[in-house]
Amino acid sequence: MSITSLLQQTTLLPEHYRALSITEMESRILSIKKKLGSKLFIPGHHYQKDEVIQFADATGDSLQLAQLSAANKEAEHIVFCGVHFMAETADMLTSKRQHVYLPDMRAGCSMADMADIYQTEQAWPILQQLFGDTITPLTYVNSTAAIKAFTGRHGGACVTSSNAKELVQWAFTQKQRIFFLPDQHLGRNTAYDLGVPLENMAVWNPHKNILETKQPIENIQVILWKGHCSVHEGFTVQHTETVRKEYPSMRIIVHPECSREVVDAADDAGSTKYIIDTINQAPSGSAWAIGTEMNLVNRIIKQHPDKQIISLNENFCPCLTMNRIDLPHLLWCLESIDHGQPHNRIQVDDHTSKEALSSLERMLARR
């Protein structure tokens, strides 16, 4: 869905919600949760702030939460505290009787938006002309339903940061090359870890409609869409050097959405779940610098007072679009459902959903 069409269907939060006290909003949210009971399910992504996550019935990554939503057959109303592409995935995986809502329709994802379906459809025939029928597309689940549908239509699969290696390996058994979108860093880091040389990777620039490479075309194994996560691209090698200087014994762990240079400079890299599990299992007194979203890092710090934990970039701000989900929007969304006039329902059309689900199903078949 384009930004323009998204804004056209957005109903703005009534101003009186912003005037409410935190105590009153929390009380009214709890009241509706109690009233609706099992008919309501609130999944909350790891990157949500604490004021929202306290009301989540489950926390996790985007795919995990979408699957939990689908498995919760009693829930008629799923209020997804995350961003737009996550709610889309939940809508596609849930049944027709289950309705998915996003408290603030402006909660998008800059990385997902970097892979526009129109640009992707323009790129594909050019890549086919360059490489022939030798490419399997892979899309990160952090992508729009339209991009997932494109991937499914062309025989590809979705990936998560946890299973990207397995899916890249699978894709190479299908065809000679992969087309990875929208996050170039996850694609590059994953392929490199599997032994693909950096010089055998090229970047597709959707703004210029060109393949950026200095290598002969026949050497290219991985085509990376020129997209990135604005949060994780904010971590730099300089940040790792500062930590090494100020905290020599501190281990650095980062998300693979960070650049190759940062991953190389870190001690470890892995998915959100991997980071959480690693810190959970670390001995008391251990020291960590974490390169991922600030709300999650702050939550990990609170959960582990026995460990020294900092953000790799302590001056960094949380994900701005995730932070659009707040108490006023959550309360407004819940009360609109309770009053029988729900706002901000997420609906993916049947044709897009069918093709997108094929890419998700290929991924799930590999797990």
From Swiss-Prot:
Its cofactor is [4Fe-4S] cluster. InterPro entries: NadA (IPR003473), NadA_sf (IPR036094), Quinolinate_synth_A_type3 (IPR023515). One of its GO terms (cellular component) is cytosol. NCBIfam families: nadA, PRK09375.2-1, PRK09375.2-4. Binds 1 [4Fe-4S] cluster per subunit. It is found in: Cytoplasm. This is Quinolinate synthase. It holds the Pfam family NadA. Its main location: cytoplasm. Keywords: 4Fe-4S, Cytoplasm, Iron, Iron-sulfur, Metal-binding, Pyridine nucleotide biosynthesis, Transferase. It catalyses: iminosuccinate + dihydroxyacetone phosphate = quinolinate + phosphate + 2 H2O + H(+). GO terms for biological process: 'de novo' NAD biosynthetic process from L-aspartate. It comes from the Bacteria. Its EC number is 2.5.1.72. Belongs to the quinolinate synthase family. Type 3 subfamily. Coiled coil: none annotated. Pathway: Cofactor biosynthesis; NAD(+) biosynthesis; quinolinate from iminoaspartate: step 1/1. The keyword Metal-binding applies. Catalyzes the condensation of iminoaspartate with dihydroxyacetone phosphate to form quinolinate.
